[in-house]
């Protein structure tokens, strides 16, 4: 029986690099889920390789526009709902440990992991935000507002200089 880690995708979406990260985590004896958070609004798509500058069938500009449109259709509440469903799913899997989970969020999903840790303190043992954006906002559901509810471990890795995550946002 393996402890559960939910690996939340970054803005470019599900792709081989995320599957590789999930495989590395799973190789350390974890049960890993890597959901497509865009399932509500977009068909799966793959950025070209090796430089990730466009989605097949789209210009670079249209690719970025699609990515940002998909991002804008997500919210802390929607992703929290998804995380709850994934936890429920894992509770019914024989090979998944039926206890609290770990969350890993990258860039756009960093705040989702942080938010879930505060909203689901009994279910989230640890949450990591790697290069997370929007960790502190003016919104009523800003992840930082729920910090006092967190019972698990939190890890934050932030860039020194990042236009998407200025100091006041982290």
Which functions belong to the PLM regions below?
Residues 1-170:
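N-terminal cap/leader regions of alpha/beta-hydrolase-fold enzymes
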